[in-house]
Amino acid sequence: MTPPPATGKPSSSLLDRVSSPADIRDFSIEELEQLTYEVRQEMIQSVSFTGGHLGAGLGVAELTVALHHIFDTPRDRLIWDVGHQAYPHKILTGRRGRMRTMRQGGGLSGFTRRSESEYDPFGAGHSSTSISAALGMAVARDLKGATNNVIAVIGDGAMSAGQAYEAMNNAGAAGSRLIVILNDNDMSIAPPVGALSAHLSRLLSSPSYHSLRHLVKDLAHLLPPSLERAVGRAEEYARGMVSGGGTLFEELGFYYVGPIDGHNFEHLLPVLKNLRDSDDTKPVMLHVVTKKGRGYPPAEAAADKYHGVGRFDVLTGQLEKPKANAPSYTSVFAKALIAEAEVDDRVVAITAAMPGGTGLDKFGDRFPARTFDVGIAEQHAVTFAGGLATEGFKPFCAIYSSFLQRAYDQVQHDVVLQKLPVRFAIDRAGLVGADGATHAGSYDMAFLGCLPDIVIMCPSDEADLMHAVATAVSIDDRPSAFRYPRGEGVGIELSERGSVMPIGKGRVVREGNRVAILSLGTRLAEALKAADELAARGLAPTVVDARFMKPLDEELILRLAREHEVLITVEEGSVGGFGSHVLHLLASKGALDNGLKVRPLALPDVFVEHDAPAIQYEKIGLNASGIVATVLATLGEARSVVSA
């Protein structure tokens, strides 16, 4: 069925009848096709209003409908890897009425979330976790003597991460029934699919084939060893002829079925039904081929298939692009790195499947031979960068803060312990807005700051970011890192190339008295606003841009402690970061013994919910008014007042 173009308000005659997946279990194929069309229209309309991940969900609309039609969710556990593609799933599982709140303050998450619905048995946001979680659920089911199915849906991109293969290796040996659906939406694995492949996949997944296969194997045991091996080789050869491409999965212990057309219900439904009803204990890999952005021509025509988009016009697909007041930090990083690479051919760049998100697509356009996209493989990316560093290159490993967490052992063991001069460009530092807690860059200062002999820079604006890049290039005797947030800078004038900063030295932005505000990172603008407000009240604080989280500018910090009554530290990181290191310094030097009042302002010890970044920071007191309130409370009370 070819859906009409996505224009106007979607007709929802069938979707209006669906409040849960149970309502679609008796639908005919024709009704399922119509329902899929309506789900796509609902999704397009919702994402045009909220922004979000559109292309992946459009690509799995038929698969989502088919899964909820065949399987008894939520009793049967359905786990979506990453969660980018789960919007149709949300629409069908009782959340349709809240789709326009998605990624908004107080609204639905942009990913699956256990606290949001019983149909989300496992939360996500990062990739390649679904098979591990599904196997855990399958083993738990067996231990409890239950009979429900467990299904994991994972994309071909997520299959580039090692955890997926670790999980498959374990699953192949565990002996628990598990269904893994490989959603191949880039044609990167599968050959063209068609009726023959669908017919053979239906055959391979059928109970009769399974029974015949077991019978042949049982009879083969009665034959002499040489003939038994020949029968096994013949069976493997025959399966390879009909399945085409499943050898790796078979070697890992999976029963491979596919590839089949993920947009054709006549192909999907019988195979899924066979897998649902199978009593085989071997895990199964079902390979489906889909088209990202399916059903919305602007998405199908776009290079990124509308993977992640802001608000857009439904009729034209034109994205709303508010006029930027300044370039984004990501684009400034790319500009700075290109400028350094122009004069130093040892500068190379590494990304873990995020060239566009990190700005390395621009670097790659200019220096393709010096740009390495290693896939969703942060652990490998870090150690690969370490290897480059041993040979005299200057690797910049550009990874989102929340994704760098996945490679912590490699950072510590492979890079920092060996003092290899890898440069970590940590994008999306601090709170990130609509993507919420799964993507927030809250912890990098805490988990990097405890490592010996690493330089950690936190630029306060886009010009400082260019200086951080230049400084990182100059550091050849140890690893370094610099962190910067999502979004645009403050609009400061930029030079063509950054300048090298003195290591571990901050700068006094404004001299004052009584109160010192020691800011690290891009909260400096809010610190200066707070200083203006306090000055209007007759109190002129000193404002300092720390610049370095490690090493600290001990001389400057101790001077601030001697000359002020109150010291406020401000950072876009969790407890255990900059403020904690400053307090440790002050305590160890006896600087707290004479009554100095220190108040660390950091991210609170909770996961901050998704919302607009400005609102997120306002709620936790990390804006100008929060700083002012903390200063006034501290001056007005003898006892400790800590803002959270």
Swiss-Prot record:
For this chain's record, the cofactor binding note is:
Binds 1 Mg(2+) ion per subunit.
Q: Does the keyword Metal-binding apply?
A: yes
**Keyword Isomerase tagged:** no
From which domain of life does this come? Bacteria
Residues holding Mg(2+): 156, 185
Binding sites annotated in the UniProt record for thiamine diphosphate: 84, 125-127, 157-158, 185, 296, 378
Q: Which PROSITE patterns did the record assign?
A: TRANSKETOLASE_1, TRANSKETOLASE_2
Report the EC number(s), separated by commas if there are several.
2.2.1.7
**Gene3D superfamilies according to UniProt:** 3.40.50.920, 3.40.50.970
Please give the pathway this protein is involved in: Metabolic intermediate biosynthesis; 1-deoxy-D-xylulose 5-phosphate biosynthesis; 1-deoxy-D-xylulose 5-phosphate from D-glyceraldehyde 3-phosphate and pyruvate: step 1/1
GO terms (BP aspect): 1-deoxy-D-xylulose 5-phosphate biosynthetic process; glyceraldehyde-3-phosphate metabolic process; terpenoid biosynthetic process; thiamine biosynthetic process
* Reactions this protein catalyses: D-glyceraldehyde 3-phosphate + pyruvate + H(+) = 1-deoxy-D-xylulose 5-phosphate + CO2
Molecular function via GO: 1-deoxy-D-xylulose-5-phosphate synthase activity; magnesium ion binding; thiamine pyrophosphate binding
Keywords on this record? Isoprene biosynthesis, Magnesium, Metal-binding, Thiamine biosynthesis, Thiamine pyrophosphate, Transferase
Cofactor dependence = Mg(2+); thiamine diphosphate
Q: Which family does it belong to?
A: Belongs to the transketolase family. DXPS subfamily.
Q: How does it assemble?
A: Homodimer.
Q: What does this protein do?
A: Catalyzes the acyloin condensation reaction between C atoms 2 and 3 of pyruvate and glyceraldehyde 3-phosphate to yield 1-deoxy-D-xylulose-5-phosphate (DXP).
Listed NCBIfam families: dxs (TIGR00204), PRK05444.2-2 (NF003933)
Kindly provide the name given to this protein in its UniProt entry: 1-deoxy-D-xylulose-5-phosphate synthase
Q: Which organism is it from?
A: Paramagnetospirillum magneticum (strain ATCC 700264 / AMB-1)
Taxonomy of the source species: Bacteria, Pseudomonadati, Pseudomonadota, Alphaproteobacteria, Rhodospirillales
